[in-house]
Structures are given as C-alpha cells and as structure tokens.
C-alpha cells in the first residue's frame, strides 16, 4: 500500500489498586498480538494502553499506606510498565489519567457537555461499591441486609463487594436522550459489539429496560479531576477513564494530529465485565461530542481457575512473572492465546499449561526444528538446497497444506480468533513432522540416485519452518527469531505480506548445531512448582506493611472477677474485617484492618494465626472488638484494640462474629 492504512487498537486502562495477574495480562497480550500482526501486514499501527489512577479506592488505599495518592499511583504505574516490558508489549503510548494533558482535556469535555445540556446538576442516592466504583439500585444488589423492621441497611454488589448508602449532590449525564440512537447504531453496525452474545446482553439487560441518567461527578472524595466551574466536584470514572482513548491522541489539545489520523479506533478490547461501559456509556458520550464511534468493541472472556476466579484468599493467583522466569516469555504468550478461545471463558490449570509446553512446543515444534537443522547439516553440509516442487510424492501435499494454512490463519487473525490461527500453524507443523516420516530422508541418503528427492525434502522442511516462524511472529516475540537464526535467515526480511510457500532465499547456510528452543519438562515437577508459587501468592504480594522482625509476646489477664464499674469502661463495637494477613516473622500474629464506624480504618494485631491458616477468608466478616483499649506497639506497628475470640476446652480459638446486618460501629451492651 502506497500510504499505509492506519490501525488503532486499545486495551482498557487498568486500575492500579493491586498487582496485575495473568488474567489482567491476557487482554494486553491479545492486543499486542493483534498490533504486531497488523504491523507485519503493513499497517500504520497505534497501540494504546495505560492506567486509570483516580477514585475513592485509590484515595483510601493511599491513606492506609500513609502516602499521597500521587505517590501511590506513581509506584503502581511504574510496576505496570515494568510488567509490560517483561511481557514485551509493543505499545505506542502509555497513558496515565493523572497526566496533565488528559486532565485538561477531560475538563474541557465535561464543560462542553454541560453547556449543551447533556449534563445537569442533581442529587444522587444509591448503594455504592468502592471496590467496583459503581452505584447500584436495591434490585441490582446480589445480597441485601435488612434491619428488624425490614429496612435495607446494606448489601453486596454483584461482584460480592460490600456497598454503602451514598447520598450526595452530583452532575448527571442524560443517557436516556441517546438510547434510541444507540439501538439504531447497533442495528446498522452489527460488527460493533463482538462476540454477538455481548450485544444481546446489552440490549436485553440494560437498554430495553430503560437507561437511567448517569452520575458523572462525586463530592465524597477529592482524588480526581476537579470541575473548573464547581471544584468541590471531581469528574467520576465514566468521563475521566473512558475519555483516555481520545485524549491520548491529543483530542482537546492544541495538537490533535494523532486524533485526526487514528480515530475512530479499529478495535477496543475489554474484559466482558466492562463491556457495558464501553458499548453504552462510551458511545453515548461520543455521540454527544459529535465524534465517530469505534469500529469494534470486543469483550473477551475471563481466565478462570478450577475453583472460579483468581483470588488471593483462595491461594490460586498466577502472576505472569513467575511463569516467564521459569518457562520463558513465549511459553506464556503461546499458552494464553492458544488454550483459550478468545471471547469465551477459559480455565488455567498447571497441568494443562505444562502439557501444552511439552506436546506443542517441545515435541511438535522443537523436534521439527532440531531434526531439520541436523539433517541439513548431515546430508547437505549445512547448505539449504534450491527449491524444486513435486520431486517426491508428498511435496505437493505439504505445499498445499501450507497454502491453506496461510489463508485460514489470516482469516482467523482478522476475526481475533487467536487460538484458531495458532491451531492452523500447528496443522503445518504436524504435517511437516508427518512428511519426515513419509519421505524417510535417512533412507534416501543411502541411494545416490535419490539425491534430488533428499534435497527436495530438506528444502520443503526448511520452507515449512520459515512459514511457521513468520506466522508465529505476532504470538511469540522471541522464538521466531531463534528459528530464523538457525535457518540462516535475516528476520528483518521475513515479512508477512504476500507470503507464499516456495520462496526460501537461495545460498543460505543453517547453523552448524541447532539449539533446542523448548526443553522437555517433567510434568509432575513443574505442576508442583506452579502450585507452590500459587499458594505463596498472598504472602508474595504483602505490600502494605513492612513488619519489624522483633518478636512480640501477647499478655493475657488471669483475673476471674472484675468490678461492674471496670466492665462499664469497656467499649465493645461491631467491626467489619476489610483486610487480614499474616505478620511476617511472627507465626502467631494476624494483622487486621477494620471498619468500626470511625472516620478511618483501624489496625488490630491478634495472636490467632495458627487457627486461621487462610487469613483472607476472614475478610467481610463482622467481628466484636474492644474499641477503647489503649493502643500498644507490636512488631513496630500500633494495635488499636482487641478482637474477641472464644476458646474451646481443647484450646482452639474462634473469632466471635456479630450478625451481618449490624452496621459497622454498632455498640454492644
């Protein structure tokens, strides 16, 4: 193409409230594969990723760590960028919503929507989840808590996170104004939401029941972009975070040349849990701004474990670094894109991961390369013979297989069916391995009159590997180069455009001794290793508190009787466990973070660790605390109270739990 066609692809921007696991990395790797594919096809690609850094959750997290929100997000953003470097993510820009240019553009967008009447000032009352950064109506709650009179006093969001009743002044976006126009757009652009099932979900669950106007500002926290004309309000996540896809290109700035060049996005890739925000809120916002909508929003499935979603409390979190360090980057990228049909949920198991590395990479691909390099060295002095077709009875079948694979591969990649595209590559790998057995070059080498056939087998195998390596380039960032190197080829000349079987360069010498690119693994050993790493995932990510290694002795009273006046001084309260984890260097201590109805969370250390091997299982429970106990220093930390436990005759301790419906801070008489 004389002037390159543009291709703009985006990941969602990640919320940096914790360490990213392979489920988070899945989206980014898939986007990276698509970006690399399009570059290899000659497109002018712009690949955007980044982090969403504002909100109440970040503000609270920073306060708990005794740092400013900006200090906290600076550290987390650096960690995300470090991970993307580890995963060799070829993004063109990394946006942070704390970037000055983004904040200025968001203020401009908000003001415009107010001026044209799409945003108005009102008052909001609803159930809010800090973890989800989302409001819910009572009917949307997965679980509802009621008092004795039947009044709703709390509950849980569909995600399982606790909600709290929030009433505050807020600016609202007139979603309902654009509902009919959005439905019409869906009908006229059936490719807009992929897979198709996601579109039906949006229509039936959200649009047809009636779109409610959306709260787009908050006053109950300050860590956000302030409104220029009403600074007590900060812009809420919908306009702040979603706008990044255009502000990153310069929309709202003096230089919007990138926006003019790349917008609308070709693909916006998101997890299925945020499809609603990207296919309802986002397109309506763009309609209000008179901007074209992205061409496609693809909502992929989740990467699950056998026992459901990844969770530190379950000890089943897999972090990409631990797999890359032991098995290499390409092993992880290959597995994530091959094992899971993109768009559907997939299940990660250590057994499946290790088995695929063995069978697909070590056995199929690795052996094909090793055998080919060894035979070319042995039978042709390392020089790849010139290409000749139809010399053996099996040549045509192999070249036809390659041609079919190339066509089906491109078709699958354009649809983002990554697992299908990779499966097509392995069709050629398998056929080439079978070709070796069919032609038996070790037999041909014994007869001089079979020399032409032997050389034909060698070039057909080398050419098959060249095709395989070219097609693998979007998926694996290191392995194709290793294959090219062993084949004696220049990676810079191995383009994907107009690739055909039979174009292997002349006068090429392979490496004198091939190196295995994927060693075979001992399955049982590696499964045990991964499981151990998963079980350590909680302690490995304790980032909140640096514990003093000095031992602490807990003192308990032995008195049987006290005066009533003494007891009357004790203030017992209901508190909710917000976080709970073991104290490093102390086998007996657990560190609790509790909401006891105070302005800030309180910290209590308790010597019950041996009775709760999975501390995270206590999160969300309502416990009873001594709230007015004089703070004491333990392990270099302040313990602000005591958690009540019951002791069995055998000496086993169990936390005393309060009724779930009791509000945090309720007194106990």
Curated annotation (Swiss-Prot):
Keywords: Aminoacyl-tRNA synthetase, ATP-binding, Cytoplasm, Ligase, Metal-binding, Nucleotide-binding, Protein biosynthesis, RNA-binding, tRNA-binding, Zinc. Zn(2+) binds at residue 161. ATP binds at residue 312. A motif ('KMSKS' region) lies at residues 309-313. Residues 566-669 form the tRNA-binding domain. GO terms for molecular function: ATP binding; metal ion binding; methionine-tRNA ligase activity; tRNA binding. It comes from the Bacteria. It catalyses: tRNA(Met) + L-methionine + ATP = L-methionyl-tRNA(Met) + AMP + diphosphate. Its EC number is 6.1.1.10. SUPFAM superfamilies: Anticodon-binding domain of a subclass of class I aminoacyl-tRNA synthetases, Nucleic acid-binding proteins, Nucleotidylyl transferase. It is an enzyme of class 6 (ligase). The keyword DNA damage does not apply. It is found in: Cytoplasm. Its main location: cytoplasm. Pfam families: Anticodon_3, tRNA-synt_1g, tRNA_bind. InterPro entries: aa-tRNA-synth_I_CS (IPR001412), Anticodon_Met (IPR041872), Met-tRNA-synth_bsu_C (IPR004495), Met-tRNA_synth (IPR014758), Met-tRNA_synth_2 (IPR023457), Methionyl/Leucyl_tRNA_Synth (IPR015413), MetRS_core (IPR033911), NA-bd_OB-fold (IPR012340). GO terms for cellular component: cytoplasm. GO terms for biological process: methionyl-tRNA aminoacylation. A motif ('HIGH' region) lies at residues 14-24. Homodimer. Is required not only for elongation of protein synthesis but also for the initiation of all mRNA translation through initiator tRNA(fMet) aminoacylation. Belongs to the class-I aminoacyl-tRNA synthetase family. MetG type 2B subfamily. This is Methionine--tRNA ligase. It comes from Enterococcus faecalis (strain ATCC 700802 / V583).
